């Protein structure tokens, strides 16, 4: 499943294609959304927001389209009039004069009013988004030490969207490698230096992945600015200590780590 950085980059691409342009045609696959087709035609998309792995597409008439890709959903941008070659099932089409955005295969799609946004079950449950620039390491540290989360093992906590939205498995293993901790630790057992390091890494690594993954700087990094240190690298040497990276299963997900330098 895509994690927060990938969802945010997808939202950026959608915004770049149609934000601020009048919608010339709107189509929904689900019957409960059909009444909104005429209501949205002629409106503009004012912004596309991410809440972890959910997208909120805000329209100028005050409505918001909530969508969660889950495992199979995917958004695409095409030129208006183009017919995509795909076997995926179309769920949403939002069209402007020159660009069209399409949502395929997703099933978790709703139209919300401003009031419903404040009471939506997923949005109520989800924690602060790691890509929200307003979120600080100090706030993350306070959240780690809160009664709700301080006694949770990191193996499960870092996958829980109620803790911090946008984290997922590759971010979980990369963050824990960065701070030299295993997944069995709990916040209540860390010293001050470890807490501070983890609080920063929980924001720094997702934000680095969002801003630089896939980009290259051959002069400085000899490759991608964001590179996996342990994810999918079992059997390889750890670049920090030379130990061999191992793979196991924690919280029902593949977990990659270096037993030599992660304690």
From Swiss-Prot:
It catalyses: 2'-deoxyribonucleotide-(2'-deoxyribose 5'-phosphate)-2'-deoxyribonucleotide-DNA = a 3'-end 2'-deoxyribonucleotide-(2,3-dehydro-2,3-deoxyribose 5'-phosphate)-DNA + a 5'-end 5'-phospho-2'-deoxyribonucleoside-DNA + H(+). It holds the Pfam family H2TH. The keyword Acetylation does not apply. Binds 1 zinc ion per subunit. The active site is at residues 2-3, 53, 253. A zinc finger (FPG-type) spans 229-263. InterPro entries: DNA_glyclase/AP_lyase_DNA-bd, DNA_glyclase_Znf_dom_DNA_BS, EcNei-like_N, Endonuclease-VIII, FPG_cat, MutM-like_N-ter, Ribosomal_uS13-like_H2TH, Znf_DNA_glyclase/AP_lyase. One of its GO terms (molecular function) is class I DNA-(apurinic or apyrimidinic site) endonuclease activity. GO terms for biological process: base-excision repair. It comes from the Bacteria. SMART domains: Fapy_DNA_glyco (SM00898), H2TH (SM01232). Its EC number is 3.2.2.-, 4.2.99.18. HAMAP family: Endonuclease_8. This is Endonuclease 8. It comes from Salmonella paratyphi A (strain AKU_12601). The gene is nei.
């Amino acid at each position: 499943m895509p994690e927060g950085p990938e969802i945010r980059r997808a939202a950026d691409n959608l915004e770049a294609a149609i934000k601020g342009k009048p919608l010339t045609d709107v189509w929904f696959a689900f019957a409960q959304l059909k009444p909104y087709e005429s209501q949205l035609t002629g409106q503009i998309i004012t912004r596309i927001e991410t809440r972890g792995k959910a997208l909120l597409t805000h329209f100028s008439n005050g409505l918001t389209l909530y969508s969660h890709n889950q495992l199979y959903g995917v958004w695409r941008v095409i030129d208006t009039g183009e017919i995509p070659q795909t076997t995926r099932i179309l769920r949403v089409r939002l069209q402007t004069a020159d660009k069209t955005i399409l949502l395929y295969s997703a099933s978790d799609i709703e139209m919300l009013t401003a009031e419903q946004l404040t009471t939506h079950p997923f949005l109520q449950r989800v924690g602060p988004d790691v890509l929200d620039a307003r979120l600080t390491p100090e706030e993350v540290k306070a959240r780690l030490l809160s009664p709700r989360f301080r006694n949770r093992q990191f193996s499960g906590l870092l996958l829980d969207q109620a803790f911090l939205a946008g984290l997922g498995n590759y971010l979980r293993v990369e963050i824990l490698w960065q701070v030299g901790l295993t997944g069995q630790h709990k916040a209540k057992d860390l010293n001050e230096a470890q807490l501070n390091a983890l609080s920063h890494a929980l924001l720094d690594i997702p934000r680095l992945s969002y801003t630089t993954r896939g980009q290259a700087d051959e002069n400085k990094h000899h490759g991608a600015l964001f590179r996996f240190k342990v994810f999918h690298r079992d059997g390889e040497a750890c670049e920090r200590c030379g130990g061999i990276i191992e793979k196991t299963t924690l919280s029902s997900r593949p977990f990659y780590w270096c037993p030599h330098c992660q304690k």
